[in-house]
C-alpha cells in the first residue's frame, strides 16, 4: 500500500490546487483554491471557456457603463466560485474560497465579501456546509470569522503561523485553521542558516503538532489542516492530523512511495498531555504576535503575497477582457459590413450586390459559388457572425 492510501486512512487529504484535472486524478475529499491557483488554471487551455464566459456575464450584468475595473472585480469573485462549483462536482467534501486579502485588516468588509461569495454558491444550489470561506488569521479576520460562523458561514483561517493565532481561532469558534508548515520552515532556515531539518525537528511540524495537541486536549472542535508543505517528510510527521492540504506534485510522490506510515498525531495521546490553557483577548493576542518575530513577518509577507497574486489575476482578466471586447468590436464591424452589402436582406451577398473590389469578394467567396454568406465573411475576418435572418 502506498503512503497516500495509508494517509487517507487517518487524515483527510485535501488537494491544494485549482486544476480540476489534478483533482480528478487524486480524488481528495476537499479542495482549496486561491488567486495564484486560479491564475495558473485560468491560463490553461482547458479552462479558457470558464474564464471567458465569466467575464462576458460580468460585463453583461453590470451594463454598458461599467468600467473594466468593475467588470474584473466582479469576475474575480465569480471565477473563484465558478472553479469552486466545478471542483464540487468532483469531490464529496468542501471547497475553500478566499476573501480578498486586501481586506485582511477590515472586519466589516471581510464579513460583507464572505456573504457575497456564499450567496453566489447558494444561488448555484450549493449549501453552506460545502464551502469554507478562507480568511487571513489577523485579529480582524478572526473577529470576522466569529461573526460569520454564527451565521452558519464556515471559515478557514489561513496564514496561520503562531500559536496565539490558533488559540484565538479556536475561541472564536472557527471551523478550520490552516497552519503553514513549509513557510515556517523557510523562515527558520533563512534565520539560522541551517540547510536541513529532519522531520521531527522541522519547526513547522513542531508548530502544528503543538496546535493539534492543544485543540484535542481542551476539546476544541476547530479542525487543523496542515498546509504549505516543502517535502513528504513533513507530511509523514503529521500523519493523523485532521486534514492536510497537499500539492499535486507531493500527492504524486506519496502515491509513488511505499512503506509503513505510522500515525504521529492522535487525540487519545493529546488528551493525556500536560498542557496549560491560554486565556486570549485582543491585548494578549497583539502582545504575543509582536513577540513572535516569525509569525509577524510571515503573516505580513503572506498577505502581501496573496494581494500580489490577486492583482496578477486581475491583470490577467483585464487582458482577457480586452481580447473579448476586441473580438466583439470586430464582430460588430463585420456584421455592419455584411448588412451594407446584403442589399436585399436575404442573408447572402451576390457578386452583383458586392460594391467592393473583386479581389476581396473572391477571397471571401471561399467555395467560389458566387455568393458570400455570413459564415464566409466571418471566416474571412476571423470572427463568428450570428445575423438575424430577413423575414
Curated annotation (Swiss-Prot):
Binding site for Ca(2+) 1: 342, 344, 346, 353
A Pfam match: TAL_FSA
Gene Ontology BP, a term: carbohydrate metabolic process
GO MF annotation list: calcium ion binding; transaldolase activity
Keywords for the protein's UniProt record, in alphabetical order: Calcium, Cytoplasm, Metal-binding, Pentose shunt, Repeat, Schiff base, Transferase
E.C. designation(s): 2.2.1.2
Protein name (Swiss-Prot/TrEMBL): Transaldolase
Species, as recorded: Thermosynechococcus vestitus (strain NIES-2133 / IAM M-273 / BP-1)
Organism taxonomic ancestry: Bacteria, Bacillati, Cyanobacteriota, Cyanophyceae, Acaryochloridales
The gene coding this protein: tal
